[in-house]
Amino acid sequence: MGYDTDMKVLVVDDFATMRRIVKNILTQLGFKNIVEADDGATAVDLLKNEKVDLIISDWNMPKMTGLELLQHVRADAAMADVPFVMVTAEAQQDNIILAVKAKVSQYIVKPFTAETLGEKLDKVFS
């Protein structure tokens, strides 16, 4: 495990059930400080007042997509280096390329397992 479980993690997804699943997996992995937002725009507002150490976001959301959120984070000097993991049903190669060009840290296609998320986080923080 190459990550600090005391870090603050932001989980962004428009489906409460998916946020709960990701939070449960993070809790199983030992994370204790998890905040959430139900879309990219809400996440941007939250990030104005809170520093996070990791962002895990869905792609398809109302108001602001996960890709737009990623681009916003990377354009902000204060957040540009925050690891960003995209967890999405978007498995098309074109979307993966867009995310990589926007400097996503890791890309996970739904459905996924707790083991997959843990492995991706190990890669992000190794």
Language model features with spans:
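Alpha4 helix (beta4-alpha4-beta5 surface) of REC/receiver domains from two-component response regulators
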Residues: 23, 68, 91-106
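Active-site T/S-Asp motif of two-component receiver
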Residues: 56-58
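Two-component/phosphorelay signaling modules centered on CheY-like receiver
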Residues: 16-35
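C-terminal output helix
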Residues: 112-121
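Receiver (REC) domain active-site loop signature in two-component systems and cognate sites
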Residues: 61
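Acidic catalytic/metal-coordinating carboxylates
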Residues: 39-42, 65-71
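Acidic, metal-coordinating helix/loop segments flanking the phosphotransfer/catalytic sites
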Residues: 36-54
